[in-house]
A protein has these predicted regions:
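Bacterial N-terminal signal peptides that target proteins for export
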Residues: 1-8
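Classical Sec-dependent N-terminal signal peptides that target proteins to the secretory pathway
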Residues: 9-16
Length: 157
């Protein structure tokens, strides 16, 4: 009887670790499909592999630039599409992500409702180059290119 109890106890602990072992950060739909993400800034010098962004430097610090960036939003949908707003226009496209390596990709061309220039063009180019993601559904989303020495950061609007 004691052996049977031990067996079920061990089985329960093992199954619990599998069921509760899913990390919220790895749930791509919970992260991406969690509402409207607003662009905060672009950063350089941060350590992508850690959560310590003490050395990350923002690309823009002037109030006018930050206001322009804040007009850029993106909404990821669980059907693999996204839509968003630019400063004076909108855009749409397709995306995919893989939680096993936190890879991210824009699939095909991003279609914009306006001729791209300035910060709008900069954002679309950086979005097209994004290859990795990290974040959570409550606080922030970061997208980085292959080198992961720069990233763009979003927060919920």
């Amino acid at each position: 009887m004691k052996t049977l109890k031990y067996f079920f106890y061990t089985l329960f602990i093992t199954l619990s670790s599998f069921l509760y072992g899913c990390n919220q950060e790895d749930d791509i739909y919970e992260i991406f499909d969690s509402g409207v993400w607003q662009l905060v800034n672009y950063y350089t010098g941060g350590d992508w592999e850690s959560n310590n962004d003490r050395y990350a430097r923002p690309a823009y610090t002037e109030a006018q630039d930050l206001e322009s960036l804040s007009k850029i939003t993106i909404t990821f949908k669980n059907d693999g599409t996204f839509t968003g707003t630019l400063d004076g226009g909108t855009f749409e496209g397709k995306w995919q992500a893989d939680p096993s390596d936190r890879s991210f990709a824009v699939i095909g061309e991003i279609k914009a409702s306006i001729k791209l220039s300035g910060k709008n063009a900069e954002f679309i180019k950086k979005l097209e180059l994004a290859s990795y993601y990290k974040g959570d559904s409550k606080r922030l989303l970061q997208l980085a290119p292959d080198a992961r020495t720069t990233y763009m950061q979003f927060t919920h609007k």
